Amino acid sequence: MEVNILAFIATALFILIPTAFSLILYVQTASQNN
């Protein structure tokens, strides 16, 4: 079974980018509350 590297990278970026973005927003709001 051949793994499509480009599809794997695209899926990883599609998941990691929104997760990292929301995590950064959470850290910023948490630091502002403190």
Swiss-Prot record:
It is a single-pass membrane protein. It comes from the Eukaryota. It holds the Pfam family PsbM. The keyword Membrane applies. GO terms for biological process: photosynthesis, light reaction. GO terms for cellular component: chloroplast thylakoid membrane; photosystem II. InterPro entries: PSII_PsbM (IPR007826), PSII_PsbM_sf (IPR037269). Keywords: Chloroplast, Membrane, Photosynthesis, Photosystem II, Plastid, Reaction center, Thylakoid, Transmembrane, Transmembrane helix. The chain crosses the membrane at residues 5-25. HAMAP family: PSII_PsbM (MF_00438). This is Photosystem II reaction center protein M. It comes from Huperzia lucidula (Shining clubmoss). The lineage of its organism: Eukaryota, Viridiplantae, Streptophyta, Embryophyta, Tracheophyta.
